[in-house]
Every structure is written in C-alpha cells, then in structure tokens.
Amino acid sequence: MLVVKDTDGHVFGGFASHTWRKNVSFFGTGECFLFSLCPKIKMYSWTGANSQFLLAREECIGFGGGGSFGLWLDADFETGNSNPSTTFSNPALSSKTDFSVTSVEVWGMDNCL
C-alpha cells in the first residue's frame, strides 16, 4: 500500500497486489486499485479494460495505464503526476497533474501465515 500527500494537502495512493519488482512491462492483478483519502474518500477499482496495473523501473513506479498513468512517482518519491487512466477509470488524484510530494508512506506485508 502506497499513500502520498502532495504540497496542496491532497492524500491519495494505490494498492499493489504483488511485491514491487523492476520490470520492463506491467505486472499485477485486478486486485490493484487507486484511491483518494483527502479531500474526498474514493476508491477506483480495475475496469477490466486492460492489464496495466503496476510498473516499476529504476527511474519510477506507476499505477494504471491506457495512455497515461493513474499515479506515477519518480525514483526518489519527490515528484509525481496523476492523470485519468483507463485501467482504473480514475480522475487525476492530485490537485495538479504534476505535483510535489510532502510525504509518502508504504506498507507491505509478506505472506507469513
């Protein structure tokens, strides 16, 4: 689970169904989703339109696709952008398409049971 707060106070993020790994192509499953927590709580589930769930490269990570990322962050988690994506049918999650990050939280759970 990745949660981002931008400089305008918007809080949003995404759930990754798989462990992040550097890859040249998209990975993940329909269990992935994007969400907004502030200013409005809303969840954006997989539409079934494509399988562009997660992308991880040395320079960035991204959620969703189909023309543009629903959520994209640079490798340092300092800047990002959010656009409508076909994968999750989300609007831009931040107040501006390109945003600066004030804080990031990441939670992960390993299959320990």
What are these regions (language model features)?
Residues 1-113:
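Phosphate-recognition beta-domain surfaces
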